[in-house]
């Protein structure tokens, strides 16, 4: 029998699908990545084509194995990690989606959320799902599809439609429609899953008018869900053995498996998660209570704060303002000036996430004078990522009663040394950047590998988490608080803008 030397992580993100092949020492052997189309039918609406998601993801799997000359019988397992909340509804007979995937960033269901609040559902949803009533989560997206796509409601009532977050859709496609599952971490992001009972909440489903028959079976983040024969020569069936939403996968990849350990992922958005173990901590500060992975992939509780615009605000500097030609140049230009010259950028392009939860906030630049140049704006945009992270971390420490000794970081933007140092300064906390920054893929691979015995256990995995660099805080306290106070004033200027703007029209 061929020795199984590899685990593959499929990392299905907001802008690209990736496949990452890891060996037994958790070294990256091969990577393949494909971008796919972002669809913006109206202002504030964001969609993806589910067929394109599957096509790009399956082709990266084939390509990553092919590039490294790896046969499928050398792969012990596949782990999946995915953009969360993004909603796919498809017909189980035809296998075709009834509508495009509605992406987590999409704000089209703001009015549905207002209507549900008016019906008094907010506190029930908060207490039982751990989430706030916001367009971000899957529940109102499913309701929108059933209410607005011709024939969808009738097909759903007849038991012909299935719902899935992206993980569910990929597993269903990869198993030729045999397996309809999700894991606890993804289920906890739908606003339809009761995190106290660990079951779909039938009261919420009834209130949203969503049939239970559409919902996938919910399983641990580390177990064999099914087999796939996609990906490489040999045609061997590979177990799909790990699933976790991208942020929970990163938390696991950083080995934050004990209560009180936390990480921040700097991707399209920023996501700060703190593992709270078996204790469900309810936030009084606008954070979410969600499910994460315990040591063996079983459900554990976590606090989460989501910032909608992290790396996406750097893309805005590049693509819309044309101030930089490459995202990596932002560090060079930001360090050409000593300060932001009193400028604050609040990148609330799609509203504000935690701890504000203001769907009507909009992007704002304040403090402009004639002396401000493009470098100041670039610097202020980078600084906004660090300020938003502090907003969330302050709330998290207040809720949990735990003062973090260090923050573990990952995601594309952690390569930016200016941002990491500024982050340490703003937080007055050490920031630890790991050697392997692909921790989301690492988490999915670890979960899959553990399920099939590729790795023995947690101790073996914890030995692989090496730190590349620690950033220590430099700012004095007075300067830190003065700058942060300025940020808070800038946020006030951005809030509720769309409401006032609409009234004026």
Swiss-Prot record:
The UniProt record gives the binding positions of ATP as: 14-16, 268, 311, 315, 412
Provide the catalytic activity annotation.
glycerol + ATP = sn-glycerol 3-phosphate + ADP + H(+)
Sorted alphabetically, the keyword list is: ATP-binding, Glycerol metabolism, Kinase, Nucleotide-binding, Transferase
EC number in record: 2.7.1.30
One Gene Ontology cellular component annotation held by this UniProt entry: cytosol
Give the activity regulation note: Inhibited by fructose 1,6-bisphosphate (FBP).
Pathway(s) this gene product operates in, as recorded in its UniProt entry: Polyol metabolism; glycerol degradation via glycerol kinase pathway; sn-glycerol 3-phosphate from glycerol: step 1/1
Binding residues annotated for glycerol, in chain numbering: 84-85, 136, 246-247
Molecular function GO terms recorded = ATP binding; glycerol kinase activity
Summarize the protein's role.
Answer: Key enzyme in the regulation of glycerol uptake and metabolism. Catalyzes the phosphorylation of glycerol to yield sn-glycerol 3-phosphate.
Q: Which family does it belong to?
A: Belongs to the FGGY kinase family.
User: What's the protein here called?
Assistant: Glycerol kinase
Q: Which organism is it from?
A: Vibrio cholerae serotype O1 (strain M66-2)
Name the gene behind this protein.
Answer: glpK
């Amino acid at each position: 029998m061929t020795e199984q030397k590899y685990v593959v992580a499929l990392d299905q993100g907001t802008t690209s699908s990736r496949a990452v092949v890891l060996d037994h020492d958790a070294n990256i052997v091969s990577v393949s990545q494909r971008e796919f189309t972002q669809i913006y039918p109206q202002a504030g609406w964001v969609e993806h084509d589910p067929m394109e998601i599957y096509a790009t993801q399956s082709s990266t799997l084939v390509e990553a194995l092919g590039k490294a000359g790896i046969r499928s019988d050398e792969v012990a397992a596949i782990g999946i990690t995915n953009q969360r909340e993004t909603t796919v509804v498809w017909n189980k007979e035809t296998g075709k989606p009834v509508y495009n995937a509605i992406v987590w960033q999409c704000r089209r269901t703001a009015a549905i959320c207002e209507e549900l609040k008016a019906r008094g559902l907010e506190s029930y949803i908060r207490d039982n799902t751990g989430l706030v009533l916001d367009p971000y989560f899957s529940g109102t997206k499913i309701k929108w599809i059933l209410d607005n796509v011709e024939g969808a409601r009738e097909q759903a009532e007849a038991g012909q439609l299935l719902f899935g977050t992206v993980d569910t859709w990929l597993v269903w496609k990869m198993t030729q429609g045999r397996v309809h599952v999700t894991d606890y971490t993804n289920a906890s992001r739908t606003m339809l899953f009761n995190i106290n009972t660990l079951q779909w909440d039938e009261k919420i489903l009834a209130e949203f008018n969503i049939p239970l028959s559409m919902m996938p079976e919910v399983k641990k983040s580390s177990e064999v869900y099914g087999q796939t024969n996609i990906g490489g020569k040999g045609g061997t069936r590979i177990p799909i053995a790990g699933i976790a939403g991208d942020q929970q996968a990163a938390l696991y990849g950083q080995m934050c498996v004990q209560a009180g350990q936390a990480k921040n992922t700097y991707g399209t958005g920023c996501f700060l998660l703190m593992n709270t173990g078996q204790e469900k901590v309810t936030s009084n500060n606008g954070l979410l209570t969600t499910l994460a992975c315990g040591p063996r992939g079983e459900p554990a509780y976590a606090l989460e704060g989501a910032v909608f615009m992290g790396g996406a605000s750097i893309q805005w500097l590049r693509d819309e303002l044309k101030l930089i030609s490459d995202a990596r140049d932002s560090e060079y230009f930001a360090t050409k000036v000593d300060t932001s010259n009193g400028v604050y950028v609040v990148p609330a392009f799609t509203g504000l996430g935690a701890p504000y939860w203001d769907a009507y906030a909009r992007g704002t630049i304040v403090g402009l004078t004639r002396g401000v140049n493009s470098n100041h704006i670039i610097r202020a945009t980078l600084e906004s990522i660090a300020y938003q992270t502090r907003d969330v971390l302050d709330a998290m420490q207040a809720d949990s009663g735990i003062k973090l000794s260090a923050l573990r970081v990952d995601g594309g933007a952690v390569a930016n040394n200016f941002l990491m140092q500024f982050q340490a300064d703003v937080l007055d906390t050490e920031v630890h950047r790991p050697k392997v920054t692909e921790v989301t893929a690492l988490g999915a691979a670890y979960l899959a590998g553990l399920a099939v015995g590729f790795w023995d256990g947690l101790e073996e995995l914890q030995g692989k988490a090496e730190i590349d660099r620690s950033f220590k805080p430099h700012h004095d306290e007075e300067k830190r608080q003065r700058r942060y106070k300025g940020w808070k004033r800038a946020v006030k200027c951005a809030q509720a803008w769309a409401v006032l703007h609409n009234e004026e029209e």
